[in-house]
Amino acid sequence: MSEVVAKKPRIPKPDWLKVRAPSGENYTRIKGLLGELKLATVCQEAKCPNMSECWSGGTATFMLMGEVCTRGCRFCNVKTGNAKIGLPAVDPFEPEKVAFSISQMKLNYVVITSVDRDDMPDQGSDHFARTVKTIKKLDPNLIVEILTPDFRGDKNLVIHLASARPDVFAHNIETVERLTPSVRDPRAKYRQSLGVLQTVKEYDPKMYTKSSIMLGLGETDEEVLQTLTDLRAVGCDVVTFGQYLQPTEKHLKVIEYITPEKFKSWQNIAEGLGFLYVASGPLVRSSYRAGEFFMKGIINKNREATPLMDAENTERIS
């Protein structure tokens, strides 16, 4: 007689992870526009708990190059496709379509991300760069943050995208080094991700870089501290901490729900290490709105200072 092995039950979600249903006038307006323009946002795809808050504040995250990724990270709910078989072709007019649509939405801060496209010769770097340039051309005042793949560590592809002049260049380390092989796709390496952020800083030391760490996957405090140290060593300016939540039964289970107090502790530690800004909380995600408000203030201040310096230089010349 065979034994029946019972499945381990999921750890129940604590009260601090419960959120209200999305609502609000700006949320309704943006949702309607997205439907009309047939645009996909990560906010909707990932069922982000901050969607209502971000949309109400004029912020949204858009995903380029389709809805099928060539990677299969065990925490992510985006569809996975086989690069050898081939994925749906990328729409060559997507940069113009996305840029025009964003210009109609009256956003203050936009985040552009993409699936991994290992099936493309340049892994989508030029398509991504064209999108950023087109958005900037249509609305020079809009703050553009990009959240990028690792481009398999190819420095030339990273630099090509950075040369499009996004205001913030984000690439997520996701988890600590020990857990990376079991959490991320085998092609996604911990040191490779650090290399992406380092390449951006080497290309332009003034470009803001950003990364994100999920907690609750079984990491230790010592490992998280080491990850923060590694990020600072490559000049990363901004870091966010959020609780990992299991999307489906097929994905990695939550090992631990981190308390709000512990998230606050990590914020204090990261700030002490010299990060320009830290967003840390159970519901915080890579592009959390609170961080965007902070970055918006810094970027606008720098933009205001640049014309002033140019004017001073002009006066000296004349």
Where are these regions (language model features)?
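Short functional micro-motifs and their immediate structural scaffolds
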Residues: 53-56, 74, 78-81
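Auxiliary Fe-S-binding modules of radical SAM enzymes
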Residues: 1-61, 65, 97-100, 106, ...
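Core AdoMet radical
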Residues: 77-97, 102-155, 161-197, 210, ...
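Glycine/Thr-rich phosphate-binding loops of Rossmann-like dinucleotide-binding domains
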Residues: 72, 120, 179, 249, ...
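Short cysteine clusters
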Residues: 48, 69, 73-76
